[in-house]
Amino acid sequence: MIVILLGPPGAGKGTQAQKIQKSHGLVQLSTGDMLRAAVAAGTEVGKKAKDFMEAGKLVTDEIVVGIIADRIEEDDCKQGFLLDGFPRTVAQAQALDNMLSQKNLKLDAVIEMKVDDEALVDRITGRYTCAKCNAGYHDLNLKPKVDGVCDQCGSMNFNRRADDNRETVSARLESYHSQTAPLLPYYKEKGVLKVVDGMADIDDVTAQINNVLSGFK
């Protein structure tokens, strides 16, 4: 089974990818991780990627797809894999399709975690953690029992990620949608696009995804 998971930053894509990996035996493939591994291993395509990176240039789609092609030949991918963060453009999607076709493989499902942008901004900007034990909290629905005091360790110091502000999050969402929007009709036309409610609670989203994937066992 070959699956692509689409979702904006903060939609919980990473959490769901881990759950899919565990429950369906799919290997989660991150293009960033694969690039670094290929460069470190000194593979032919890794050397090409290194040349681009050292020159301060973006690695080409051809090289990224080549790295994916090498990676999925490994034994742990024989039962299937989940692509996280790729493709981001129609050109990348087409290159991926061509590569899979050459290997007599096909994409089974593209799962879009659909979100409400304004609600997602609230979800992301409201989160914070204990500076001491890293326990997670939220302004809207997960405040400490005693205001300003961590439930877990009693610390009164909390941290927020610097990029968890409304302007930055909104810009990231806008970038995601501008890149990803053309992918949706592309995959819908191929009959592989499945949409789940990314604003539901974690377990409900997992159940929706499992329902989609159950048709491919």
Show where each model-derived region lies.
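Glycine-rich phosphate-binding loop of ATP-dependent small-molecule kinases
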Residues: 1-217
